[in-house]
Amino acid sequence: MKVEFAPLNIPLARRLQTTAVFQWVFSFLLLAQCCIGIFICLVLARVWLLLALYVLWLYLDWETPQAGGRRWEWVRNWPVWKYFKDYFPIRLVKTCDLDPQHNYIMGFHPHGVLVAGAFGNFCTNYTGFKELFPGLTPYLHILPFWFRCPFFREYIMSVGLVSASKKSVNHVLSKEDGGNVSIIVTGGAEESLDAHPGSLTLNILKRKGFIKVALKRGAYLVPVFSFGENELFQQVSNPKGSLLRCVQERLQRIMGLAMPLFHARGIFQYSFGLMPYRMPIHTVVGRPIPVKETSHPTQEEIESLHQQYLGALQELFEEHKKRYGIPEHESLIFI
């Protein structure tokens, strides 16, 4: 395989962008393991006082990821996130105003491999969320598993990540005067296995838990489609029924984590590696679907609102696809 190396005279800004994305990929793939390793090293080194203090902290703080987390604006304002945003670049697109007197559930589509668009738009302050949607506070929900990793949990909470448990979503949406936004990647980890370039397959037909929560809380539903999310990585071919796909799905059921085998470019060359391609991401926030609070929603009400949401998502995609390079004949595939 011929390796295409990056030229030496790359501007400093682009080098900083690459560095920013490298630390993000490292954090996503390896930082949790490193933090667990540090914790084990402290045990082996018998640093008992420090360990006792941290274990006590974990005991007292264990429920925080399910109670709105603990964001630090100074972390969300780190300059590294500006370079992260500019690498692709990432752009947040508003289609209409959102009244801060309501709470919202934003369904984010598609998952992609590493959910770069969701992180860049809702976990940093560099794509203009606060300016586009004044009075709203975004909470991006991820697998509860990550909040069990010592030290790593503090880092991911600092940027506004919270648990995807039902308790966590209900807590975010319980704000009586409105202004909170739960961002749920509704396709879940399973959808990442379909994150191939050009793929428009969304795992959503059986995903109705967020619909039920929206009805119980009276939270308005907002479809969000991130154009370019699936273009960031190549993935080893894994069609349904293949041996690789069966193994991946089995591991996903056991561990709750999907393991897509992906690759793209490297730091100093463009031929292979785990760095994403420089492809633009346009995250389009659709129009809200009003939802009346219903303490005990029936199955018919859940189905009806789910169909309404699917229609709004399809409409959002069709309205914007040509602008972002999707051929006219292409449409979303719901599975």
Curated annotation (Swiss-Prot):
Record has Transmembrane as a keyword: yes
UniProt topology in membrane: Multi-pass membrane protein
Molecular function, one GO term: diacylglycerol O-acyltransferase activity
Glycan-linked positions: N125, N180
Substrates-to-products reaction catalysed: a 2-acylglycerol + an acyl-CoA = a 1,2-diacylglycerol + CoA; a 2-acylglycerol + an acyl-CoA = a 1,2-diacyl-sn-glycerol + CoA; a 2-acylglycerol + an acyl-CoA = a 2,3-diacyl-sn-glycerol + CoA; a 1-acylglycerol + an acyl-CoA = a 1,2-diacylglycerol + CoA
Pfam family for this entry, one: DAGAT
A cellular component annotation (GO) from this entry: endoplasmic reticulum membrane
Enzyme Commission code(s) on record: 2.3.1.22
Keyword Ribosomal protein attributed: no
Gene Ontology biological process terms in this record: diacylglycerol biosynthetic process; glycerol metabolic process; triglyceride biosynthetic process
Alphabetized UniProt keyword annotations: Acyltransferase, Endoplasmic reticulum, Glycerol metabolism, Glycoprotein, Lipid biosynthesis, Lipid metabolism, Membrane, Transferase, Transmembrane, Transmembrane helix
Enzyme class: transferase
Listed pathway(s): Glycerolipid metabolism; triacylglycerol biosynthesis
Locations listed in the record: Endoplasmic reticulum membrane
Positions of transmembrane segments: 24-44, 47-67
InterPro entries the record matches: DAGAT (IPR007130)
Function noted in UniProt: Involved in glycerolipid synthesis and lipid metabolism. Catalyzes the formation of diacylglycerol, the precursor of triacylglycerol, by transferring the acyl chain of a fatty acyl-CoA to a monoacylglycerol, mainly at the sn-1 or sn-3 positions. It uses both sn-2-monoacylglycerol (2-acylglycerol) and sn-1-monoacylglycerol (1-acyl-sn-glycerol) equally well as substrates, and uses sn-3-monoacylglycerol (3-acyl-sn-glycerol) with lower efficiency.
Family, per entry: Belongs to the diacylglycerol acyltransferase family.
Protein name, as recorded: 2-acylglycerol O-acyltransferase 1
